[in-house]
């Protein structure tokens, strides 16, 4: 039987002996499943050591904390990014994506601030979004009012869009130089406009092919408690997308969120927003973060696309 996976991902799945896929029964089972998977990856493959050439500083800010990254040989003229980690608004954190942020800071030659936003279900919407806005304003003051590249993965990509749009709606569009959204959530499945529903099939097609299964995504939305049609969560519906300066989106072809990326690109194109877009057929959600040797070229290509986008926005 022909595999839907790209060759390098297929090699990883064969070696691992399973397709990484979170159970979706409830939040406890998701957290347990993710913990087990992360432990297996660490034991069998190991995660690369952090890049110590990138300097870090932790900052406490009104109940949340931030980690600031500065690449080697920084001059103070580098672009500034604000990064939101993934995890369906309920898990993950700055520490979990520290290595990834160090790579972004070095490869993109940018000063980066990673946000430890509050998680659901303990803090429901709009807690994480409010934290994003607070972090953006803090980063602005720290880095001489330099416009920010708002960046994020998965739910973090959603927060990057939401924070940018909230700033725009608060007459602070000048604080945003662009959005870098990696496999982002852009719309609640129940909020997809009727005329676009035929194009929104990834939740069915990729339900069990990716770490963020269809069932897990439902749990994430249920925990976050954002209204289905809220325009800072279902950002596809926001009436002022045309105010976004520049946007980069990375799509993973076997992701439940594949069509979130595609529909957002279509909406941005209609609004005549400058867009860079990279698609990776045959790869599932966050494939660029998994530590397996066959995925090295995929990871380098993926990060190269991110770096190119940051240069374009700077």
From Swiss-Prot:
Pathway listed: Mycotoxin biosynthesis; aflatoxin biosynthesis
EC number(s) stated in the UniProt entry for this protein: 3.1.1.94
Active-site residues, Swiss-Prot/TrEMBL: 154, 255, 285
Gene3D superfamilies xref list: alpha/beta hydrolase (3.40.50.1820)
Catalytic activity as recorded in UniProt: (2S,3S)-versiconal hemiacetal acetate + H2O = (2S-3S)-versiconal hemiacetal + acetate + H(+); (3S)-versiconol acetate + H2O = (S)-versiconol + acetate + H(+)
Keyword Cell membrane in record: no
Keyword annotations from UniProtKB, A to Z: Hydrolase
Top-level taxon in the UniProt lineage: Eukaryota
Its job: Versiconal hemiacetal acetate esterase; part of the gene cluster that mediates the biosynthesis of aflatoxins, a group of polyketide-derived furanocoumarins, and part of the most toxic and carcinogenic compounds among the known mycotoxins. The four major aflatoxins produced by A.parasiticus are aflatoxin B1 (AFB1), aflatoxin B2 (AFB2), aflatoxin G1 (AFG1) and aflatoxin G2 (AFG2). Within the aflatoxin pathway, the versiconal hemiacetal acetate esterase aflJ converts versiconal hemiacetal acetate (VHA) into versiconal (VAL).
InterPro entries, alphabetized: AB_hydrolase_3 (IPR013094), AB_hydrolase_fold (IPR029058), GDXG_lipolytic_enzyme (IPR050300)
Similarity remark: Belongs to the 'GDXG' lipolytic enzyme family.
Protein name according to UniProt: Versiconal hemiacetal acetate esterase
Gene Ontology BP terms: aflatoxin biosynthetic process
Pfam families with a match to the protein in the record: Abhydrolase_3
Motif stretch (Involved in the stabilization of the negatively charged intermediate by the formation of the oxyanion hole): 85-87
One Gene Ontology molecular-function label: versiconal hemiacetal acetate esterase activity
């Amino acid at each position: 039987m022909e595999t839907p996976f790209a060759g390098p991902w297929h090699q990883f799945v064969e070696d691992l002996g399973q397709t990484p896929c979170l159970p979706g029964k409830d939040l406890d089972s998701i957290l347990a499943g993710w913990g087990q998977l992360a432990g297996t990856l660490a034991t069998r493959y190991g995660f690369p050591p952090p890049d110590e050439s990138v300097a870090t500083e932790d900052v406490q800010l009104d109940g949340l904390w931030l980690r600031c990254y500065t690449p080697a040989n920084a001059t103070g003229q580098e672009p500034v990014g604000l990064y939101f980690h993934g995890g369906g608004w309920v898990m993950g954190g700055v520490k979990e994506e520290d290595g990834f942020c160090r790579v972004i800071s070095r490869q993109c030659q940018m000063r980066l601030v990673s946000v430890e936003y509050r998680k659901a279900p303990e803090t429901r919407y709009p807690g994480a979004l409010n934290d994003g806005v607070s972090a953006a304003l803090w980063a602005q003051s720290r880095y001489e009012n330099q416009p920010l590249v708002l960046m994020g993965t998965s739910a973090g990509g959603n927060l990057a869009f939401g924070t940018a749009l909230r700033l725009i709606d608060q007459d602070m569009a000048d604080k945003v130089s662009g959005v870098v959204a990696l496999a982002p959530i852009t719309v609640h499945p129940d909020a997809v406009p009727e005329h676009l529903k035929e194009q929104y099939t990834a939740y069915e097609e990729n339900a069990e092919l990716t770490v963020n299964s269809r069932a897990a995504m439902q749990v994430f939305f249920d925990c976050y408690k954002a209204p289905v049609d809220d325009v800072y969560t279902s950002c596809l519906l926001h009436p002022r997308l045309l105010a976004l300066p520049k946007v980069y989106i990375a799509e993973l072809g076997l992701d439940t969120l594949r069509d979130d990326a595609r529909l957002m690109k279509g909406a941005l194109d209609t609004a005549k927003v400058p867009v860079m877009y990279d698609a990776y057929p045959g790869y599932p959600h966050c494939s660029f973060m998994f530590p397996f040797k066959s995925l090295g070229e995929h990871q380098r290509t993926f990060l190269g696309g991110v770096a190119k986008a940051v240069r374009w926005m700077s």
